[in-house]
Amino acid sequence: MIFSRYFIPIILTLLTSSPLFVDADPNMEELEGTWSSKSNTVFTGPGFYDPVEELLIEPDLPGICYSFTKDGHYEEALYRVKPNPKNHSCAVASVTYQHGKYELLSNGSLVLTPIAVDGRQLLSDPCNSEDPSKSTYTRYVQSTWFKTYQVYVDSYHGRWTLQIYQFDGSKMQPLYLAYKPPVMLPTIALNPTDEASETASTLGSVSHKIKRSRMRIKRSLENQYRTNAKREIYTEKFDKIWWSSVFCLALASSYFFLKR
């Protein structure tokens, strides 16, 4: 009687309020999709970076987004703002795009290796630049190593969540599954270069290859709204877990009232 009155409600509360973790063994299939931070304004794909015009498109709010395919490709879109508490007009903002291949190690670590020629960053540092009204646009390449990650259903938001742990074990902000399959630009080199000798024939050949590559990318961008990617918020698996929890709660409540 005492157990049913005091301990069953506590156990059920913990059951229904805790994150529901799945897939104990790390695998690429559980990573597949586009994962975006809580601001829900930063997404990978052509809406963030236009490789034909080499244009970074600034989102409405800061945030981060990572997309993964199940065959080892990734893309990242980062919009970060670092405030200056002493002078609010000196905030540093950066918009960063990279894509490439990732490796999932046996210990659960993630190693992201970008395509060096494709990374781009737009940096605004008004208090440390000659012209505060202008931002700096540069090539950017930075490999990344994440210590580990977890994929689970957040019971509060009811969404699939990706929790990444940085190299030092600290948590990144949680990312929520937005699209599956992922929304990404082509996984090939978007801005290829060639270091061959600069003869006329070589330059013509390289120019032709780059032109063909850009045409493929352009066609991909034209088809961006024909993607079969779906926004993933509620899933059948989560519904089963949720209704199982509701059934357990109802059963325990009935037992509690019948015993009184």
From Swiss-Prot:
S-S bonds: none
Biological role stated in the UniProt entry: Required for normal levels of the cell wall 1,6-beta-glucan. Involved in a protein folding machinery chaperoning proteins acting in various physiological processes including cell wall synthesis and lysis of autophagic bodies.
Keyword Membrane on entry: yes
Cellular localisation: Endoplasmic reticulum membrane
Glycan-modified residues: 87, 107
Database matches in InterPro entries: Rot1
Transmembrane segments: 241-258
Family: Belongs to the ROT1 family.
UniProt GO cellular component terms: endoplasmic reticulum membrane
MF-aspect GO terms: unfolded protein binding
Any matching Pfam family: Rot1
Coiled-coil annotated residue ranges, if any: none
Signal peptide (residue range): 1-24
GO BP annotations listed: 'de novo' protein folding; budding cell apical bud growth
Record key words, sorted: Endoplasmic reticulum, Glycoprotein, Membrane, Signal, Transmembrane, Transmembrane helix
Protein name: Protein ROT1
Coarse class of the protein's main subcellular location: endoplasmic reticulum
Positions on the Lumenal side per record topology: 25-240
Membrane topology per record: Single-pass type I membrane protein
Cytoplasmic-side segments: 259-260
